[in-house]
A protein has these predicted regions:
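WD40-repeat beta-propeller superdomains and closely related acidic/aromatic-rich repeat-like regions
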Residues: 3-338
Length: 338
């Protein structure tokens, strides 16, 4: 284990934020229903909205804690973040130049106070959502920042990049530590529901588990034969779910460290995964749409077709009633349970 290394932060050019709104409605979409006897928590989803406004691929999505606002980040040199009201279907905010090029990842802190974004300009940017202003940039990474995670108490922010993993104090807005330097490229991060464990997935198919309070590596293991594109903890904290470019999704028992289930069904890379807050439904995204799985049985329940190209990002709302998706077709779609 390398020792903690303190890094620096700086404030950079102020991104532009303004608030606006227009009404959008759902585009054509289909739902393929696979006969199943398994119970469904996210039952009979229907397309509620289809948002247009980005100039490139949607790389990241996040809901506010009250599920009333959806935030989307655009890639391909767009660097724009857009905010959408999920009750009215209106766009209510835009942050131009949120990142100099692509917005690789974004999140809203669990307390709802802070929006965080990162990109391949090596910076992390913070906004105060209560007062609608830019607050600070964290600078310390020397390469593309690909992933973000925040602790349940909104105190610790973790960032993953081509040069490793760094930790930041989100409340005091200062750097905390560097866990790994110049390791494999960190594509995805997740923090356990109790805030004690950090999971990272890299471009070599390796997953590592860290003690978030000490920064010590608990264990690492080769999980997939290709890049780990997404990791997420189940709400009970007992299982880690990983998705990969090897086309598989795996469920890992955190007590034994063994695979409890392997889910197959995507015809290409698994780009993103998300778990409904009740822990019953897993969503996965790829070239062939969005697949909904019964997390207990591993059974494929439904496939949602709404995007005309790869689906690159998905997120469940905290109230468990909506699933948002973003794709290479530059659209953001919101599905609602009926």
């Amino acid at each position: 284990l390398r020792p903690y290394i303190i890094v620096a932060f700086a404030t950079v050019a102020l991104p532009v934020m303004f608030w606006e709104g227009f009404c959008v409605r759902a585009a054509d979409a289909t739902v393929e229903v696979i006969p199943s006897q398994a119970p469904q928590s996210f039952a009979n989803p229907q397309l509620l909205y289809s948002f247009s406004g980005h100039a490139g691929t949607i790389k990241s999505l996040a809901f506010s804690p009250d599920s009333n606002v959806l935030v989307s980040g655009g890639a391909e040199n767009e660097g724009v973040i857009r905010l959408w009201n999920t009750k009215t279907g209106k766009r209510v905010g835009t942050i131009r130049k949120a990142q100099k090029t692509a917005v690789e990842s974004l999140l809203i802190s669990p307390d709802g106070k802070t929006l965080v974004s990162c990109g391949n300009d090596n910076t992390i940017n913070l906004w105060n959502l209560k007062k609608n202003y830019f607050t600070r940039s964290f600078v310390g990474h020397t390469s593309n920042i690909l992933s973000l995670a925040v602790s349940p108490d909104s105190k610790v922010l973790v960032s993953g990049a081509l040069d490793g993993i760094r930790m930041w104090d989100l409340l005091q807005q200062r750097p905390l530590a560097t866990l790994v330097r110049f390791d494999n490229a960190i594509f995805t991060l997740a923090i356990s529901p109790d805030g004690q464990m950090l999971a990272s997935g890299d471009n070599k198919g390796v997953i590592k588990l860290w003690d978030l309070s000490t920064g010590k590596l608990i264990r690492g293991f080769t999980a997939h034969s290709n890049t780990v594109s997404a990791v997420v903890f189940t709400p009970d904290g007992k299982t880690l779910v990983s998705g990969s470019r090897d086309r598989t999704i795996k469920l890992w028992n955190l007590n034994s460290g063994e695979v409890s289930k392997t889910l197959t069904g995507h015809d290409n890379w698994v780009n993103a995964i998300a778990i409904n807050p009740d822990g019953q439904t897993l969503a996965s995204a790829g070239r062939d749409g969005i697949k909904l799985w019964n997390l207990t049985t591993g059974e494929l329940i439904k496939t949602l077709y709404g995007h005309s190209d790869w689906v690159s990002a998905i997120a469940f709302s905290p109230d468990g009633q909506m699933l948002a998706s973003g794709g290479f077709d530059k659209k953001v779609q919101v599905w609602r349970s009926q």
